[in-house]
Amino acid sequence: MSKIDVAEFFATVKSKHATDIAREHAYRPALEKLLKSINPSLTVINEPRRIECGSPDFVIMRGDIPVGYVEAKDVGLDIRKMKGANKDQQQRYRDGIPNLIYTNGLDWDFYRHDSDGNSQRIADVSIGDYLMGLQSNKTSFPALEALLYD
């Protein structure tokens, strides 16, 4: 098992956010590095080809088989209170993707389809607080690491 470094990921997100010009795509290299650290045998693709329900930001592959997708939103966007087009997209992805992670870099929601094919949030964790100027919640780092390994 390789080492996931959530602290390094958070520090990178915080540093980019501090520029006050970073947006959603600016955080993707750090997210890709974090996802690749889960297991060296996995392939992580940023901006994969479109699938039936849309174009999630990342696909995680084992060989040529997709094992999960990740949708990354901008830091500060509340992924648990989506509205409008973001809410519609989230529902499409939850309905169409059996193993999905939604994140804004700080909040992480993990969805899996149950035996009936219905999307269920199986876990959520927050590794930082946006309202307090991007303060880390280091006690949650191990929980995120465990969820990513799973």
Per-region residue spans from a language model:
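A short, conserved, highly charged catalytic patch centered on acidic carboxylates
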Residues: 1-99, 107-149
